[in-house]
Amino acid sequence: MGHIEYTKKMSATPEALWAVVGNPNTWGEWFSIHERWMEEPPAVLAPGNKLVAKVVMLGMANKFEWNVASVEAPTTLTLTAAGMAGVKVEFTFEIAAAGDGSELSVQGDFEGALIKGALGKAVEKDGLKQLEKSLDALDALAAA
């Protein structure tokens, strides 16, 4: 099992961040592992929603069936997903006010037969790199 977590001070307000995070149609602009939707996503995220996407990590494509586990707008979103080769993931995004901007914390867990040993460590390393890149792009988009 792999685990990543990252917290970043964001210049955008919590409401501006939520407007982007909570809108699946923006994910291609900031969520770096997201390549494209394979099915039209819902306009508004609600518990139980299913979102089918092509994602890329470590240069490898995978089809993820994201499920919205919980939503507490505008502060928390938890997504779970099942992918090919038994890959399972869970991501939680938590947004809090911090001064003039926000603090965004993301935690992610990965598991599956392939995510062990050296490959598990590579997934964690790439996942953290992608998460940092994603949050930079998210802040720029939300603050625009």
Language-model features, listed with the residues they occupy:
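Hydrophobic pocket/interface hotspot
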Residues: 17-21, 27, 51-53, 68, ...
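A generic structural signal for beta-strand entry/edge sites
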Residues: 3, 48, 74-76, 99-103
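Beta-strand/loop substructures that line and gate deep hydrophobic ligand-binding cavities in soluble
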Residues: 80-133
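Hydrophobic/aromatic beta-strand elements that line small-molecule binding cavities or substrate pockets
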Residues: 8, 64-70, 89-97
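Glycine-rich portal/gate segments that line the openings of hydrophobic small-molecule binding cavities
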Residues: 38-83, 133-144
